Amino acid sequence: MGLLNLPVIESSLRRVQREFEIINQQLGWQRDPMSDEVIANLLAGYAYVDVLVQRDIDVFAMGKHKHLLQLNNIVLCGVDPTRRAEFSGLIKATENRFYDEPGGGIEDVVEWHARHLDQSVWRRAAGLYVRALSKPQLFIEGNHRTGALLASYVLLRDGKPPFVLAVENAVAYFEPSTVLRDTSKLGPMSLFRLPGINRRFARFLQDQADPRYLLAPDALTIPVPSHRPFPDHRDCASPALNDHDVVAPIAPPLFEENPHVRQDP
C-alpha cells in the first residue's frame, strides 16, 4: 500500500482545472489551463514520489540524482514510451542542463540541501523549490510542477502531507512562483532576497498541509542525518529499483538502469 491518497489528490487538481479561468483572472501573469494530460502526468509524478519514499531512496545521494531528472520527464512527457520518443530532443537537452548548468544544475540543489539539513522540513522543502525555480532554473521546462513534487518528496520523507495545488491556494502559489523564475540565485543580491522568499514559502507550505492527501496520518518518517558525506563515483553503479515491483501508474521501466542513459557524475 502506498503513502499518498492519489484519488483525493486528483480531486483537488480537477477542481483547479474546472475553475482555472476564474483563478487565471486573479493572476498578474496569465497561465495556460491545466489539461487532462498535465493532471495525468502530475499524478504519475506523485506516484513516483510515493515509491521513492517507500523504498527510502535518497535522491540527493550520489548515484540517485537521476530520479529527480525522471520526475521532470514524467511531468513533461508522462510514462508512455511513444510519447517520450517524441520528446527525445528535449529530454536529452534537459539532461545536459541538469548535470552541467553552472550554478543552476543538480550540484547546486544537492549542495544547498547538504548545508540546510539542520532546518525544519518546511524550510528545506521551500528552499529546494526556490532553488529549482530561481535563475538559472534546474530544468528547461516544468520547473513549477517538478519543484512542487520535489518539495512533496521532502515533506513525505518527514511524515508530512505533500503539497497539492488546490483552488484555495492556487493564487497564493502561482504569484510568488512567477516572481521566482525571474529572480537570480547567483550574486550578492540573492543573499538578501532568497532567504525571505524561503521563509514565506515555508509558512505557505505549512499552512497548506492537509492530512487527507495521506492514506495514513502516520506516514513513514525517514531520519535525516546531521551530515551527509558524498560517496565516491562507484556509487553510480549501485543497482536501481526493480521495475517489476513498481506500482501501476509508473509501470514502464523508469527505475531500471539503462547503460545508454547518462549516470550521475
Please state what every model-predicted region is.
Residues 1-265:
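FIC/Doc superfamily catalytic core
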